[in-house]
Amino acid sequence: MQWEVVIGLEIHTQLSTQSKIFSGSATTFGSEPNTQASLVDLGMPGVLPVLNKEAVRMAVKFGLAVNAEIGQHNVFARKNYFYPDLPKGYQISQMELPIVGKGHLDIPLEDGTVKRIGITRAHLEEDAGKSLHEDFQGMTGIDLNRAGTPLLEIVSEPDMRNAKEAVAYVKAIHAIVRYLGICDGNMAEGSLRCDCNVSIRPKGQVEFGTRCEIKNVNSFRFIEKAINSEIQRQIDLIEDGGKVIQQTRLYDPNTNETRAMRSKEEANDYRYFPDPDLLPVIIEDSFLEETRATLPELPPQKRERFQSQFGLSTYDASVLASSREQADYFEQVVSISGDAKLAANWVMVELGSLLNKQGLEIDQSPVSAEQLGGMLKRITDNTISGKIAKMVFEAMANGEGSADEVIEKRGLKQVTDSGAIESMLDEVLAANAEQVEQYRAADEAKRGKMFGFFVGQAMKASKGKANPQQVNELLKAKLEG
C-alpha cells in the first residue's frame, strides 16, 4: 500500500524580552539556578501577574510578518496540570482567543519550488521551569529561572508531507523570528523548540490517521531524523496488523528511534478557563500600525529581490537570505565588487566552508565583507586569477590584511602582458616539442585532453600568475598556427 504522510508542527519560540512575561525577573540564559525567579514565578499566594507589553509587541510583529489575522481582543487562560517545575499548578497560556490567528508562510524547497504552509495560530504563554535529573543522585533538582519566560507558540496547519518540508518550514520560521529580532533562535539553549505531529494515511484518503506528537526536538537534523523514524514506525506497525495509538513520544538520537512518554492529552484534559487575574488584551489600530512600520524586509521578500535584482537562482537567493547577517554581508560584498553571482559563490562556498571549519557565525567572520569585496574586485579587473584568489582569501583569514596588501606583499599580481605570456609559452612549447607534434597530429577528440597538459605546464611556468584566459587563447593560436 502507498502511504501519505501528514505533518503539523508546533514551534515554541522564546521571546527576547529583558524581563519575563508576567514578572520583572530577568531572562538571561545560564544564570545560577533559581536566581531569576520572583514571587510571581514561584506561584506564591497573593501575588499578581502584570503583562509585559514588549512580549505583546513581539507577538504582533510575528503575526504581521506571516500575513496573519491579529486578535485585537485576546484573552489569557489557565492551562491546568501538575508537574514539579510548574509551581502554580497551571500555566498561563491562550486558548479560544489567541493573539495571532490564521496566516501563512511560503517556504523554499530543495527542488527550487515554493510551497505555502498554513499557520493556524500563534499564542503567548509562559514557559515552565526545568527539571534537572543528571546533576543529582536519586533525586531531581528544579530550576525555576526559566519559569515565566515569554513563549510564542506557533501552530502550523498539517500541510507538510515529508520530513524535508518540515525542516524547510522550521528554517523559515527560524529565519523570520531572527530577522524580526524577537528570538535569538538558539536551538541548543532551547530558545526555539519544536513538537512534531506525525500521522500516515493511505494515499488518496481524506481523513487523517491517528497522530503522535514528538516533543521538544531541538535541531534541524534531529527534526528530520525524528520524523522519518516515526513515519517508519507507524508504517511498520500498521503493515504488521497493529494500530497507531495517539500518544506523546520522545526522540532518542542515540538509537534514532522515538519512544512513548504518555498518552496524548486533549485540550479538555487541561481544563482551560480565562485567567481571572488578567484583563483581556485590547490591541488598538494605532498599535498595529506602529508595529507594522517597524517590520524589516523579511526573507521571502529579500529572496525575491535577490532573484530579480541580482539574477540569482531560487536556491542561492534562499541560502543568502536565510539569515539577516548573511544577507547584509552579501549585499555589502556586492556593493564593493559589483559582481553579484561571483559574490554569491564566494559567500556560500569559500566563506561558508571557512566558517563551518572554525565553528563561527558570519558576524564573527575573520574575513570582513569589505575585505572579500575588495578581493573579488581584483578578480574582475584581472589583477589576480580565481586560483590565486584562494591563496589571498586564506591569507586574509589569517590576519594578513586586505587583498591589495596580500597581493603586494606576496607578489601575486597576475601577468596580463601578452608579450610576456607569449614569451613564456614559447619556452613551454620548446620544452615539450614531442607533445606539440603529437597534438598537431591528433584528432579533435584527443586534442581536448592534450590541451589541458599544455595549460598546466604554462600555469606551472608562470607560478599561477598568468591570466588563464589569455593563456588559453594564445596557446591555442600557437598550437594550431
UniProtKB/Swiss-Prot annotation:
What is this enzyme's class at the first EC digit?
A: ligase
Q: Does the keyword ATP-binding apply?
A: yes
Q: Which residues cross the membrane?
A: none
GO molecular-function terms, A-Z: asparaginyl-tRNA synthase (glutamine-hydrolyzing) activity; ATP binding; glutaminyl-tRNA synthase (glutamine-hydrolyzing) activity
Q: Which PROSITE patterns match?
A: GATB
Keywords from UniProt, A to Z, are: ATP-binding, Ligase, Nucleotide-binding, Protein biosynthesis
User: Which InterPro entries does UniProt cross-reference here?
Assistant: Asn/Gln-tRNA_amidoTrfase_suB/E (IPR017959), Asn/Gln-tRNA_Trfase_suB/E_cat (IPR006075), Asn/Gln_amidotransferase (IPR018027), Asn/Gln_tRNA_amidoTrase-B-like (IPR003789), GatB (IPR004413), GatB_C_1 (IPR042114), GatB_Yqey_C_2 (IPR023168), Gln-tRNA_amidoTrfase_suB_CS (IPR017958)
EC number(s): the record gives: 6.3.5.-
- Any single GO BP term: translation
Reaction(s) catalysed by this chain, per the record, are: L-glutamyl-tRNA(Gln) + L-glutamine + ATP + H2O = L-glutaminyl-tRNA(Gln) + L-glutamate + ADP + phosphate + H(+); L-aspartyl-tRNA(Asn) + L-glutamine + ATP + H2O = L-asparaginyl-tRNA(Asn) + L-glutamate + ADP + phosphate + 2 H(+)
What this protein is reported to do is described as: Allows the formation of correctly charged Asn-tRNA(Asn) or Gln-tRNA(Gln) through the transamidation of misacylated Asp-tRNA(Asn) or Glu-tRNA(Gln) in organisms which lack either or both of asparaginyl-tRNA or glutaminyl-tRNA synthetases. The reaction takes place in the presence of glutamine and ATP through an activated phospho-Asp-tRNA(Asn) or phospho-Glu-tRNA(Gln).
What does the record note on quaternary structure?
A: Heterotrimer of A, B and C subunits.
- Record-linked NCBIfam families: gatB (TIGR00133), PRK05477.1-2 (NF004012), PRK05477.1-4 (NF004014), PRK05477.1-5 (NF004015)
* Family affiliation: Belongs to the GatB/GatE family. GatB subfamily.
Entry protein name: Aspartyl/glutamyl-tRNA(Asn/Gln) amidotransferase subunit B
Q: Which organism is it from?
A: Pseudomonas syringae pv. syringae (strain B728a)
